[in-house]
Amino acid sequence: MGINGTSLADNNLSWGVQESYGTNGQGNGASANADWRATYGELKAAYDYDKNQRRLSYGIQGGVLAHEDVITIGQPLDSTSILIKAPGVNGVSVNNQTGVRTDWRGYALVPTANPFRKNTISLNTETLPNDVDLELTSKTVVPTKGAVVIAEYKANIGRRVILSLSRKDGSPVPFGAIASLNNGEQNSIVGDDGQVYLSGLPDSGILNVKWGKSIDEQCRVDFNLSSDSGSSEYSMRIIDRKCY
């Protein structure tokens, strides 16, 4: 008879216990085993005994990949594998990959991939830090046999807000206007009632808003989010701002 199962938040600890019986005590014995799969490797341990002997075994194994950015450590690698690259996004788990999480730099190893087929790698958004918003949460790659391919994710790291923008006369900024950060690297479209969602914002900066070519069809917002109250530093906020 025996029992087995999985434990921990990501079910990355698998274990089993078995016990056997024989006539007049002959063949009596028991065994237990555990396998812990984590970000930086895999740890196995087993113990069994019978009438004549006791045995204990254990081991640790993992994989190391040197690439152009850093060295990434993970679980034992198959001949075909995937490198997740999400700079600055640490501790995020990968769906359907037991124990795989991004390291402190934002890299992770998916130890096994299917060659010459589409492999979809999806990050678990429930494990994202509060100050991170991903442009895409899943990527599809097609590796050749024996290759290591990269699944790269672009993250906006910073504050997340919904700005309710109004013009000088108090009317909302028109639907469809383009709101751009002063560095021009991030654009968002204004929705109903002058509201625009922005992620990865710095504490302060300038937002340029444009819905036409004339000077009357554009405005700008100077923001300083550190002066606004909120439930926590990186929680979602809804803030009213005048656009001049």
Residues of each region from the PLM?
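Flexible, glycine-rich linker and terminal segments associated
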Residues: 1-178, 185-191, 197-244
